[in-house]
A protein has these predicted regions:
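Bacterial N-terminal signal peptides
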Residues: 2, 6-14
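Amphipathic alpha-helical segments
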Residues: 20-142, 162-170
Length: 170
């Protein structure tokens, strides 16, 4: 916000305000998340990690079954002890698997978003040049704007055109 204010003040002090300044706003996050590449990457991530998620669902069911058996009161002391040990082992395994999965998903998601974010900046810069814009501000830093100044959909379309899915966009 301070950078925008400084830029506007610099333009004003240079007398450039009399020459119409063209400003647009963009919701960069929304534009990025709506690209075909990000949508495909999300589907690919879900498919890639589904077997691990399914395994964790199975472990959770196993833990529920163990708890049901323990609550039944039909086990002797040795059986109860063995089942409790098995339950603790499965609980630790589940926690490790959940943490590993979360870290793996987050790492891949971060890589995808960083690459796509850089591409989005390039697409927005090119779009701004095509539209003759002087300043493009993210809506995160904007208190108010008229919808006519929003180029979010245009940026998504420009990104999809520049980086079509399925043509080596990775």
């Amino acid at each position: 916000m301070k950078t925008l204010l400084a830029a506007l003040l610099a333009l004003a002090s240079a007398g450039a305000v009399s020459a119409q300044v063209k400003i647009a706003v963009i919701n960069t996050q929304k534009a990025l998340l709506e690209t075909d590449e990000i949508k495909k990457a999300q589907r690919d991530l879900e498919a890639k990690f589904k077997p691990r998620q399914d395994q964790m669902v199975k472990l959770q069911k196993d833990l529920q079954d163990i708890q049901t058996q323990l609550n039944s009161g039909k086990l002797n002391e040795v059986g109860t002890q063995e089942l409790q040990t098995e339950g603790q082992r499965k609980q630790r395994e589940l926690q490790r698997d959940q943490q590993d999965l979360q870290e793996d998903v987050e790492r891949e998601r971060t890589d995808i978003l960083q690459r796509a974010g850089s591409r989005m900046q390039d697409a927005v810069k090119k779009l701004a040049e095509e539209k003759g814009l002087d300043i493009v501000v993210d809506t995160v830093n904007t208190v108010f704007y008229k919808p006519a100044f929003d180029i979010t959909a245009d940026a998504t379309a420009a990104y999809n055109k520049a980086y079509p899915v399925g043509t080596g966009s990775k």
